[in-house]
């Protein structure tokens, strides 16, 4: 990563790294190098969950645990993180292996979402919890202003099921079609079948549940519900 690119991505993120190797690692997919971003992603996922949970706790003093959990799930889910990645144009900074490059990995939501988490982890290691918390809250400022408790915070699988039931349609079927990677770091691919849609809706995620949620979200969009 040359100096110009490094300077550009740091400006986009709103943070200047002391240890540039952490930035480089955060942007490196496992297909490109043995020194990839998955451990940083693990760390960043936990930090993000804490920061968002704390923000919701402070902003909504009278909301119960269930609503806060649903709001947090909405804010930290894969497609929300991918939206942030698109806003930062992260795809153009990723270091991918040839296979992922050819298959359009720089546009894949799961890779982009994981990279945002890895960046959070790397910024924490490069600075401290206060700095990374302030940065996350800046990234999420508009989303935190807009979010509110209610049915819209139900997860995609629940919303899809309730929609289909309201139309007296069959419930969706989910099938695992591929599990890639080692046991501690797998990528699941799920097919979701809806009776009124001819093709399968494809979801991916780091767990079966996340992949099913991704597929359900795509089904809701396909059905014109969202």
From Swiss-Prot:
Homodimer. SUPFAM superfamilies: dsRNA-binding domain-like (SSF54768), RNase III domain-like (SSF69065). Keywords: Cytoplasm, Endonuclease, Hydrolase, Magnesium, Metal-binding, mRNA processing, Nuclease, RNA-binding, rRNA processing, rRNA-binding, tRNA processing. Signal peptide: none annotated. This is Ribonuclease 3. Its cofactor is Mg(2+). Its main location: cytoplasm. It is found in: Cytoplasm. It catalyses: Endonucleolytic cleavage to 5'-phosphomonoester. It comes from Buchnera aphidicola subsp. Acyrthosiphon pisum (strain APS) (Acyrthosiphon pisum symbiotic bacterium). Belongs to the ribonuclease III family. The gene is rnc. GO terms for molecular function: double-stranded RNA binding; metal ion binding; ribonuclease III activity; rRNA binding. The active site is at residues 45, 117.
């Amino acid at each position: 990563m040359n100096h110009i690119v490094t300077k550009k991505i740091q400006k986009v993120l709103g943070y200047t790294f002391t240890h540039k190797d952490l930035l480089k690692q955060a942007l490196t997919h496992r297909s490109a190098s043995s020194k990839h971003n998955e451990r940083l992603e693990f760390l960043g996922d936990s930090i993000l969950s804490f920061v968002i949970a704390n923000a919701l706790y402070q902003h909504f003093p009278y909301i119960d645990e269930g609503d806060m959990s649903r709001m947090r799930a909405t804010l930290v889910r894969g497609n929300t993180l991918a939206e942030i990645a698109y806003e930062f144009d992260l795809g153009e900074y990723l270091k991918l292996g040839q296979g992922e490059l050819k298959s359009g990995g720089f546009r894949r939501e799961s890779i982009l979402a994981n990279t945002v988490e890895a960046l959070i982890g790397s910024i924490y290691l490069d600075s401290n919890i206060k700095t990374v918390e302030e940065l996350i809250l800046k990234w999420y400022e508009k989303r935190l202003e807009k979010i509110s408790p209610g049915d819209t915070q139900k997860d995609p699988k629940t919303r899809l099921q309730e929609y289909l039931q309201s139309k007296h349609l069959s419930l969706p079927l989910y099938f695992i079609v591929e599990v890639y990677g080692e046991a501690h770091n797998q990528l699941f691919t799920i097919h979701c079948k809806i009776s009124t849609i001819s093709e399968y809706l494809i979801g991916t995620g780091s767990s079966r549940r996340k992949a099913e949620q991704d597929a359900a979200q795509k089904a809701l969009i396909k059905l014109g519900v969202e």
